[in-house]
Amino acid sequence: MPFHLAPYLAKSVPGVGVLGALVGGAAALAKNVRLLKEKRITNTEAAIDTGKETVGAGLATALSAVAATAVGGGLVVSLGTALVAGVAAKYAWDRGVDLVEKELNRGKAANGASDEDILRDELA
């Protein structure tokens, strides 16, 4: 018997978030592969951007599911709520990531470390 991933993931909010992360991550990866081929970004930049977009899409999708469920209502109300909550969550995620990156870049400028050095230190 085949395994049906989407219905399985749709049974829970974390599952819905995982599904959103898969879709958002795939879209980010497709974008970054094109940018890599055009030599507009490095491998490290592509990996970091893909990771950020994957997590952001998953969180936004999960939050939109929670909001739509909490509000209830008809199809239009549920879709509208999911859209507004998803946009707000993704905006907040992106803004938070931007602030963290500014702080990291400020520290990087102070000690002269490259993105690769910082990533290597974080993974060690």
Swiss-Prot record:
Changing residue 45 to A: Fused MIC no longer improves iron particles, does not bind magnetite. Disruption phenotype: No growth phenotype, magnetite crystals are slightly smaller with a wild-type surface. Deletion of the probable mamGFDC operon leads to a slight reduction in magnetic response and slightly narrower magnetite crystals. It is found in: Magnetosome membrane. Keywords: Biomineralization, Iron, Magnetosome, Membrane, Metal-binding, Transmembrane, Transmembrane helix. This is Magnetosome protein MamC. Probably involved in magnetite crystal growth. The lumenal domain may bind the magnetite crystals, affecting crystal size and shape. Residues 36-56 are annotated as: MIC, when fused with the C-terminus of maltose-binding protein (MBP) or expressed as a fragment, improves quality of iron particles during precipitation experiments, binds magnetite. Its main location: membrane. One of its GO terms (molecular function) is metal ion binding. It comes from Paramagnetospirillum magneticum (strain ATCC 700264 / AMB-1) (Magnetospirillum magneticum). Probably interacts with MamA. The lumenal magnetite interacting component (MIC, residues 36-56) binds magnetite in vitro when fused C-terminally to maltose-binding protein. Isolated MIC binds poorly to Fe(2+), Fe(3+), or Ni(2+), but improves quality of iron particles during iron co-precipitation experiments. The lumenal loop (MIC) probably has to form a helix to interact with magnetite.
